[in-house]
Amino acid sequence: MAPHAMYIGALWAVLSRLRRADPERYADRQLGSLAADLTPMEKAELYADGITPKRMGADETLRLKNGIKEIITEAEQAAVYEGLTGASPREMRTLLLDASQHPEYSCLSPLAVLSCIRALCRGGDYGFLRETPSAGYHDHAGFIEQVRERWLDRVDREFRDSTGLVEEARYGELFDRYITHVSHYIKGERVFNRVTGVNEEPDREMMASVEKTLGAGSNTDTFRRGLINAIAGYAIDHPGDKVEYGKVFPRHLERLKEAYFADRRKHLQEIGQDIMRRLADEAQDGLSHDRAELAKAASERLYARYGYNRDSLRDALGELLARRYKP
């Protein structure tokens, strides 16, 4: 079984069973409005991992996180309650069995699962497939591309991490340094430079560069104070714990990472193409020694870290390159 094949089937099945929230059932009308505004994918991610939409502000995010239990309870109260209709476990077992026997793939591949879901939607043999889409819900055929994109998000992260272009810890180190300088800037203090042993003014150029990447806007003082307040809030809620910026500011760290890889997109494309040549057993005479070794190392990391074999990697990476790394 290829990596993420079950994830694709499970995610599509969950999306097929979700219903839009009814804001009239909420005592907190603002929470009801936020819940009703969630797309099916956003609602699935909120239920599964407590992930809130990036498009929402800090106050909306907090209200939504605090109201997850109420959103779940509301969904259980309707006559046609959430989960009543949609793909059943039995139907998904049959679909996965069919996908595992797909003639175009040597294993249970995510692409085979997507193909079988598409065929299921075209057939319209089940009642839930004949539901009328509303506000993005019950759009079972439309969910296919959304699920594909979430799968490619995972493949993309695995591929980029496998290249070794930069270690994950580097983003944290940059953000740690940024927060240190912001904290001293707000307090009007100097920063101790461990290299020179001298107390120096906060690095305004570094702070401005990071803030540009984070989309801080023109009011940087407000942005900086918001960060420090968020850290203080985390410390109050988690007394005695070390503040983990990855938990407090996951989106900021993700933006730093995305910006780094955006600058290296062409290099990533070359590495991906070199890996595909290796998988196809094509001659690599035109590659430099360094490029050949990098492709080999990245392939081996994908095998060892993420459970790919040659066939499943060819399927996943080929799809990723075709959809996200076109020349």
Question: What do these predicted ranges mean?
Answer:
Residues 1-92:
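Conserved AAA+ ATPase small/helical "lid" subdomain
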Residues 89, 93-327:
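Terminal-proximal interaction/regulatory segments of ATP-powered molecular machines
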